[in-house]
Amino acid sequence: MGAMINIIYDTQNVSNEEADMLSHGIQKLVMDVMAVKDVFVYAQQPLVVLADPIEVFIQVNKAEVKDPAELTKRIASRLSAWKQENDFKPAININVHPVEWHYKIGI
């Protein structure tokens, strides 16, 4: 598995259209930065209390990421450029989490 992205957003400050745009944009961006195809996104709109408008949690395969800090910088840089290109205004926090996955598919 390449990466699993969870986007949590506050519907008071972020529209569903903006969340959809971000979901598709960040999926492609992470695929490009990591050079992997297996990247999927969940966008959620739970009750948000005293949190920033958009939190993005990116779980990556620990075995494939040698330097999480460098990966975070690369993703942040590309995301910043994407925001400008798409006139995307809401602030975004990103969190990169290397994980060791053990999974079975299609059970």
Residue ranges and their predicted role:
Residues 14-21, 65-71:
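Short, conserved charged micro-motifs
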Residues 103-107:
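Short acidic DE-rich linear segments
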Residues 11, 60-62, 98:
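Non-catalytic surface loops within mature trypsin-like serine protease
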Residues 21, 25-33, 74, 78-85:
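Generic non-transmembrane alpha-helical segments
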Residues 1-6, 33-60:
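Short edge beta-strands and adjacent turn/loop segments
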Residues 2-20:
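N-terminal presequence-like segments and adjacent domain-start helices
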Residues 38-44, 84-102:
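A short amphipathic beta-strand at an alpha->beta junction
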